[in-house]
């Protein structure tokens, strides 16, 4: 069983790497954004609660996010492991996830942190916004999102570093280079790709 988290600033290629890791290690990429969207689309009771909060411009509270993530991790494909992307985001969610996994006799194997120089990420995102004609995505807005990321994730990163779970990986470079760095970091922790990955 492989149970991983991935964190990284906007523009560090986290979504791309998450899909790749999930495929190579034969585990589902469990993204809170995807869970929210699927529940809204399916018009589940929880999905309707999320929709009402989002429509009102409010954050989805921990309790609701925790319930949605718990339900997703109980699905058949997540029983043999998972890669969590976008969760946990608060210290309360960190504690909840730990308690949840302990209740199932499980624990996290590693937390992958994609590390990227802020100036390089800002330059990358500014270029992308210009190419896509998104004038509202200026450097100031992009830097603000980077600051929010650092402020929100620093306490979580500290917790996982203290627990010896954190794997810091340089997130800049070609997609294949970054993927290889992640594989090497996980191998150092004894986590290897699934021989069944890619077989359906």
Curated annotation (Swiss-Prot):
Superkingdom in the source lineage: Bacteria
Amino acids binding ATP: 11-16, 128, 173
GO biological process, alphabetically ordered: AMP salvage
Chain segments carrying region LID: 127-137
GO cellular component, one term: cytoplasm
Residues engaged in binding AMP: 32, 37, 58-60, 86-89, 93, 134, 145
Gene3D superfamilies: P-loop containing nucleotide triphosphate hydrolases (3.40.50.300)
PANTHER family: NUCLEOTIDE KINASE
Protein name (Swiss-Prot/TrEMBL): Adenylate kinase
Species this chain originates from: Clavibacter michiganensis subsp. michiganensis (strain NCPPB 382)
